[in-house]
């Protein structure tokens, strides 16, 4: 019997022994459940299954770090244009004689070691500081960021289930939108859910700058934001204390960031 055959028989024996020791072993679930809510009350109405690979990924801080560093690198403009020694304004003459002073040898006033001297490694704009990351690694970071928000109870999905026939509260809808344009409608939402000191991120399925919610969010600055689903980065997901996402946007994220594994 060859070595490969012996190895195969050994592995099969281990599998059989494991099955006999754990006769009632269970297969882990493939899906987790996300709650569908109405807006702005966030009243739950139904649940729908989401694959574990998307919303139940194990937390990997090293992968999140790689994604955030790449995003910040790519945001750098690279417009700095510091003067080098040849561009600086001072004379090229030595500040002191080479010998006879009892002091260390010095060059001209453009030396980088001098106060108000030139830059040793000057660059000429535009400078490209962008870095790259494998697509599969970035997709993993995105899934980890969403899974972290889901496990921490920070993710709220707004939408309607096809089979559910729940009744809505007055002023509610299954769309991520305010039903009226009252100037304090969003203030009521923030106060009711205790979000005054938290960062809130809204991600609609289709961004409309003329929508009531988009206009209301624009008055809040950086504390309450709304982004197009195509513009959301890993940093945005990690910075938000509450993620209010439409079901269409969540389906879009699932299709985009699990295409290499499902």
Question: Language-model segments: which ranges?
Answer:
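Extended polybasic, low-complexity segments that bind anionic RNA or targeting/receptor surfaces
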Residues: 2-73, 124-262
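Residue-level signal for pocket-adjacent positions within structured domains
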Residues: 45, 50, 83, 90, ...
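A short, flexible low-complexity segment enriched in Lys/Arg and Gly/Pro that occurs
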Residues: 59-98
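Short coil/turn segments at secondary-structure boundaries
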Residues: 83, 100, 129-133
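Glycine/serine-rich anion-binding loops at beta->alpha junctions
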Residues: 88-120
